[in-house]
Amino acid sequence: PSSNAVTTWYHLADCAGSELTEGKSTLVIDGKKFNGPLDDPSRPLVNTVVMTNSAPSYATNDRTLISSSALGVHPSAQSEQQVRSHLAALYKVPTSNWTHVATYPIPDALPMMAAPHDVEQSVRLSDGVYIAGDYRQVSSINGALASGRRSAEAFLARVQSH
């Protein structure tokens, strides 16, 4: 199937995670991004999260690791500066002293979901054969988990009925 690209940036912040999202493991989404043009270069990010608020071991010496994602491939230094500016707006803190750790442009990150997409399609292919995957639900980690759960539940219901 066709796919969508995603680029993820990792930064080490110069402040505690508690200063960014009150120490909560919260996915930050820019609601203003979806009120204007989706390709606005000043708002490249779809979401960002303070990884070390939920997994402190992801950074050493009490550092704060931030993961931020945008649709499309954005490998340039200019893109990183736009991301940094967007992060400053989202977290309401200066980001000029944040350390850029890595950028991962992934051309085939998520399956493209053409409309209409049947998220309730059968998970049973044949007797004893079940199928799951993000492309069968919603193209995301959550979609993959939901699809896996639906398949597992269908399999268990079948096994328990015999």
Residue spans for each PLM region:
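Mid-domain catalytic core of redox enzymes
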Residues: 1-81, 86-90
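Conserved flavin/dinucleotide-binding core of flavoenzymes
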Residues: 51, 55-162
